[in-house]
């Protein structure tokens, strides 16, 4: 009984070591930190209508201002009434892929505008939207592989103990 209990304690240093490695990766890899923010939680973004253009500027939070998202965004429906009493709405978009290429705090994405003759054409100069995304808890390529590696080491150690 005591031997098996001491054997189970051997997993603790392995787990702690892996957790330290993961934390070090997240602290030293700015892309991992940005991905953690972009993919790990719901964040408020602001779309700015540039007038005649269909381009919308997506302002990132200060935590991700060091990088620009150039990957694809899921299509969003831009709906709402042109009357001042109605608030235009943007449906939730999902970030499907992300590339970090330069230091910039904005990203340009395209929306399909309603016909100019439509009474529902959006005239608002500013709307907000919540983009919900993956439930990943860390940078892509750093947290999950390390977690699987820890589980693999624990399984092997258990089988040979």
UniProtKB/Swiss-Prot annotation:
Induction: Induced in response to cell wall damage. It comes from the Eukaryota. Residues 123-137 have a biased composition (Low complexity). Residues 140-161 form a propeptide. Its main location: secreted. It is found in: Secreted, Cell wall; Membrane. A lipid is attached at residue 139 (GPI-anchor amidated glycine). Residues 1-24 form the signal peptide. It is a lipid-anchor; GPI-anchor. Keywords: Cell wall, Glycoprotein, GPI-anchor, Lipoprotein, Membrane, Secreted, Signal. Residues 111-139 are annotated as: Disordered. GO terms for biological process: negative regulation of filamentous growth. Glycans are attached at residues 77, 104, 120. Disulfide bonds: none annotated. The GPI-anchor is attached to the protein in the endoplasmic reticulum and serves to target the protein to the cell surface. There, the glucosamine-inositol phospholipid moiety is cleaved off and the GPI-modified mannoprotein is covalently attached via its lipidless GPI glycan remnant to the 1,6-beta-glucan of the outer cell wall layer. One of its GO terms (cellular component) is extracellular region. This is Cell wall protein YLR042C. It comes from Saccharomyces cerevisiae (strain ATCC 204508 / S288c).
């Amino acid at each position: 009984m005591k031997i098996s209990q001491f054997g189970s304690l051997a997993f603790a240093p392995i787990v702690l070591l892996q957790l330290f490695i993961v934390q070090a990766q997240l602290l030293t890899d700015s892309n991992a930190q940005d991905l953690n923010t972009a993919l790990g939680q719901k964040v408020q973004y602001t779309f700015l209508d540039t007038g005649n253009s269909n381009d919308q500027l997506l302002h990132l939070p200060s935590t991700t201002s060091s990088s620009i998202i150039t990957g694809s965004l899921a299509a969003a429906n831009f709906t709402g009434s042109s009357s001042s009493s109605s608030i235009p709405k943007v449906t939730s978009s999902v970030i499907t892929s992300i590339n970090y290429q330069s230091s910039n705090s904005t990203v340009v994405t395209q929306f399909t505008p309603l016909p100019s003759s439509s009474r529902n054409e959006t005239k608002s100069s500013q709307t907000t939207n919540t983009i919900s995304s993956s439930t990943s808890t860390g940078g892509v390529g750093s947290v999950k592989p390390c977690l699987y590696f820890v589980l693999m080491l624990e399984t092997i150690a258990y089988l040979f103990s």
